[in-house]
């Protein structure tokens, strides 16, 4: 848990449980997880994210939230594996600079956007929207400036390539 002190940059982090792997997390809890947050580099050629989180995802219950700040299209694999679970994307406006081997500085916008990864999911858009709004409200109570996006792909593209089109053109498939 990260708690922000209003009006300051002071953070308080409380860690309730530390586990060595996902299976240990699954066995350490007697009830299903409401959210699974993936903050990893998506390397689908190296490993399958769906395989890794399978033991902590409860069908029709767990919301899978993927930090897609620097990626595109990684949610599809999760939606195919967990068709009855809402998969949301999270895009952060913050920049991260490594100052030393274990020292990092956050700068830039603190805005966070969440929204359904794919609107053509098997899950109704109203349910995806409700989950997005519930998560945004939860994060807002912790003083995180979180907004619900109706088009999360827009935030992903803006974050990855910037707001202008002066850079070279590229083609992507998702």
Question: What residue spans do the PLM features occupy?
Answer:
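Internal alpha-helical scaffold of NAD(P)-dependent oxidoreductase catalytic cores
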Residues: 84, 101-174
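Rossmann-like NAD(P)(H) cofactor-binding subdomain of soluble oxidoreductases
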Residues: 11-105
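Glycine-rich phosphate-binding loop and adjoining beta1-alpha1-beta2 segment
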Residues: 1-13
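Flavin (primarily FAD) cofactor-binding/catalytic cores of flavoenzymes
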Residues: 2-5, 22, 51-57, 79, ...
């Amino acid at each position: 848990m990260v708690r922000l002190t209003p009006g300051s940059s002071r953070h308080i982090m409380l860690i309730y449980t530390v586990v060595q792997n996902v299976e240990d997390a699954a066995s350490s809890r007697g009830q299903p997880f409401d959210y699974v947050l993936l903050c990893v580099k998506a390397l689908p050629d190296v490993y399958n994210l769906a395989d890794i989180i399978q033991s902590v995802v409860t069908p029709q219950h767990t919301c899978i939230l993927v930090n897609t700040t620097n990626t595109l299209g990684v949610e599809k694999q999760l939606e195919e594996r967990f068709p009855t679970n809402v998969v949301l994307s999270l895009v952060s406006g913050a920049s991260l600079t490594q100052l030393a081997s274990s020292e990092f500085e956050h700068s830039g916008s603190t805005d966070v956007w969440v929204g359904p990864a794919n609107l053509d999911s098997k899950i109704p858009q109203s349910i995806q929207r409700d989950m997005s709004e519930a998560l945004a409200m939860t994060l807002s109570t912790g003083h995180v400036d979180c907004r619900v996006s109706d088009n999360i792909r827009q935030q992903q593209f803006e974050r990855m390539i910037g707001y202008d089109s002066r850079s070279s053109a590229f083609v992507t498939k998702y």
